[in-house]
């Protein structure tokens, strides 16, 4: 795995790349075009594989939930945009993706995967990296899974909601926090209000 240029609390590495858009058209997109919104940017190893369609379809199916909280989802792999389109046009019952609500970026030169530190150099594919980027373009969260295990859309949504809550209110979110749950005031005395309610 390459070390990359992606660091928590720093600007996410910008990129320009060709993507297959939800309307099935090819378009060059830039990460910086999404400034003003949160972005969930995730890598997957390859098109026409086994775990990948389950993740991509899961994120696509729930894209509207993310849009409601001002967050866009972008997927990426080292495959060409032509390969992405062929996979989208393959029926789900045959391992395809079907109609997508999210763009799929083509990183054939592996530059983006290297910049984000997810390139599996010996195979030339990306690990399952997931990056949450805030509306200012700052990287807030990084997770990288080994190839055989998929990610949780619920956990991704929870994390975006938690970062947005802390951005807005200045309070911090404890383990397992969900919208509506108690938060902690980041102050030695005021935090006792939260801890006094614990069993």
Swiss-Prot record:
The gene coding this protein: PRDX1
Family per similarity comment: Belongs to the peroxiredoxin family. AhpC/Prx1 subfamily.
Record note on quaternary structure: Homodimer; disulfide-linked, upon oxidation. 5 homodimers assemble to form a ring-like decamer. Interacts with GDPD5; forms a mixed-disulfide with GDPD5. Interacts with SESN1 and SESN2.
Top-rank taxon: Eukaryota
Pfam families: 1-cysPrx_C (PF10417), AhpC-TSA (PF00578)
Keywords: Antioxidant, Cytoplasm, Disulfide bond, Oxidoreductase, Peroxidase, Redox-active center
A GO BP entry: leukocyte activation
Domain Thioredoxin: 6-165
Catalytic activities: a hydroperoxide + [thioredoxin]-dithiol = an alcohol + [thioredoxin]-disulfide + H2O
GO molecular function, one term: thioredoxin peroxidase activity
Function of the molecule: Thiol-specific peroxidase that catalyzes the reduction of hydrogen peroxide and organic hydroperoxides to water and alcohols, respectively. Plays a role in cell protection against oxidative stress by detoxifying peroxides and as sensor of hydrogen peroxide-mediated signaling events. Might participate in the signaling cascades of growth factors and tumor necrosis factor-alpha by regulating the intracellular concentrations of H(2)O(2). Reduces an intramolecular disulfide bond in GDPD5 that gates the ability to GDPD5 to drive postmitotic motor neuron differentiation.
Active site annotation, chain numbering: 52
SUPFAM superfamilies: Thioredoxin-like
Protein name (database record): Peroxiredoxin-1
Other facts noted in the record for this chain: Reduced levels of PRDX1 by RNAi cause the loss of motor neurons but did not alter the number of motor neuron progenitors or the dorsal-ventral pattering of spinal progenitors, and did not compromise motor neuron survival. The active site is a conserved redox-active cysteine residue, the peroxidatic cysteine (C(P)), which makes the nucleophilic attack on the peroxide substrate. The peroxide oxidizes the C(P)-SH to cysteine sulfenic acid (C(P)-SOH), which then reacts with another cysteine residue, the resolving cysteine (C(R)), to form a disulfide bridge. The disulfide is subsequently reduced by an appropriate electron donor to complete the catalytic cycle. In this typical 2-Cys peroxiredoxin, C(R) is provided by the other dimeric subunit to form an intersubunit disulfide.
Compartments where found: Cytoplasm
